[in-house]
Amino acid sequence: MTTPAGSGSGFGSVSWWGLSPALDLQAESPPVDPDSQADTVHSNPELDVLLLGSVDGRHLLRTLSRAKFWPRRRFNFFVLENNLEAVARHMLIFSLALEEPEKMGLQERSETFLEVWGNALLRPPVAAFVRAQADLLAHLVPEPDRLEEQLPWLSLRALKFRERDALEAVFRFWAGGEKGPQAFPMSRLWDSRLRHYLGSRYDARRGVSDWDLRMKLHDRGAQVIHPQEFRRWRDTGVAFELRDSSAYHVPNRTLASGRLLSYRGERVAARGYWGDIATGPFVAFGIEADDESLLRTSNGQPVKTAGEITQHNVTELLRDVAAWGRARATGGDLEEQQHAEGSPEPGTPAAPTPESFTVHFLPLNSAQTLHHKSCYNGRFQLLYVACGMVHLLIPELGACVAPGGNLIVELARYLVDVRQEQLQGFNTRVRELAQAAGFAPQTGARPSETFARFCKSQESALGNTVPAVEPGTPPLDILAQPLEASNPALEGLTQPLQGGTPHCEPCQLPSESPGSLSEVLAQPQGALAPPNCESDSKTGV
């Protein structure tokens, strides 16, 4: 609902970046059982991880970059998102991170990563890279054999045929099938969304951004975010200004999402920006660092900004990930590369090759049906659930986690629109859902206001009932706004989609969109009953 003071929907209904620091998933998973059967093909123990709403791949990249510090394992990352644009961004970001160093240098790769990932506007060279890479991916998606040959780390086999078609359409839009900035006028869309969010406070938006930063984000542990960079992002959508401000003028099409809206009594397909305009992309890589000197203060003020810390962390992350390319090129010289990277222990295996991990994308809306497949039931050693997907934490999903497996739930700590009492209510609700799904709090887990950590109890929780939301639990409507609240007027959007572009998955009727989180969590268990499961290729999981 929109009020004169604004909609309060800064979180948006589509997530483009994470609202928590990147995790090393190996550090969060149970220790390797030495008696467990290793993968017969690769002769290494496997780590199977299911991630709901991880959005930007930061946890996966962090895990891969830290793999050299752990015994060698094969990773199977199963990623489930609620929109295909997020899947496409995963693929683009990973293809960039795994780009051959000979084709793109480390600095260029890190700068391109930051701009594509967190900026609403791009420099022309970065936009050209997005178009070229999107064109390549658009040709690979319909051809599984070529896709497996060129991107051996990627698996789309679980997606439905219509989802693959829609994914191809997303890449073709990014590649410039519809020419000109008028196809996605990002600056106008951003301003329209900001006006809708702030309402009568729009003219005082600088004061609003300073208040949100100092009284909310700084108080919650993100002191390194500088007022100038936060204000610039709130005004323009440009979080990482690595060049002169005039260089950023090409709309970032990877932030576009399609949707069916009601316009004068008719359903109209339109593209727009419905992502975050409140917190920003600074939290994922910008508020923590392995190098403690980046976080030091002088006269009570941080010496580095969140943008500078993000650039340093991403550069180091991509430097570590590039070891796979060198390992593949040099064949067997892994020991020398390990010592060159400075591993802490001589006996620790070197970083794995690209073929030692696979990213599997699961069909949209398949969380309630995964347990019907024997290949998923009790398979995963680690389950990660983002704060916007907590309503999917049900006993059926818990059945997919192996006994003794761990659960990590992202909390709403860095959501600007959430008040302190709402945070406490959300944390309580997370504990209730985790317990109903068969999990118990981890014993000895370090205290955290950002993540809730649980482990799978031995008893099955499939027969449990998720309790209804108690009257005292505050509603968290800002986590998943209905379309009427989160979308600006249709006149503020781009032109309607043309009939030649498939949009069956990215565009959803308002009745199919997620309601407020409290409404979803309060549904009786029968309303969440999964339909019958059919074949993966035709109907998905």
Curated annotation (Swiss-Prot):
InterPro entries: DNAAF3, DNAAF3_C, DUF4470. Pfam families: DUF4470, DUF4471. GO terms for cellular component: dynein axonemal particle; extracellular region. Residues 332-353, 490-541 are annotated as: Disordered. This is Dynein axonemal assembly factor 3. GO terms for biological process: axonemal dynein complex assembly; brain development; cell morphogenesis; cerebrospinal fluid circulation; determination of adult lifespan; determination of left/right symmetry; heart development; lung development. Its main location: cytoplasm. Keywords: Ciliopathy, Cilium biogenesis/degradation, Cytoplasm, Disease variant, Kartagener syndrome, Primary ciliary dyskinesia. It is linked to Ciliary dyskinesia, primary, 2: A disorder characterized by abnormalities of motile cilia. Respiratory infections leading to chronic inflammation and bronchiectasis are recurrent, due to defects in the respiratory cilia; reduced fertility is often observed in male patients due to abnormalities of sperm tails. Half of the patients exhibit randomization of left-right body asymmetry and situs inversus, due to dysfunction of monocilia at the embryonic node. Primary ciliary dyskinesia associated with situs inversus is referred to as Kartagener syndrome. It comes from the Eukaryota. Required for the assembly of axonemal inner and outer dynein arms. Involved in preassembly of dyneins into complexes before their transport into cilia. It comes from Homo sapiens (Human). PANTHER family: DYNEIN ASSEMBLY FACTOR 3, AXONEMAL, DYNEIN AXONEMAL ASSEMBLY FACTOR 3. Belongs to the DNAAF3 family. It is found in: Cytoplasm; Dynein axonemal particle.
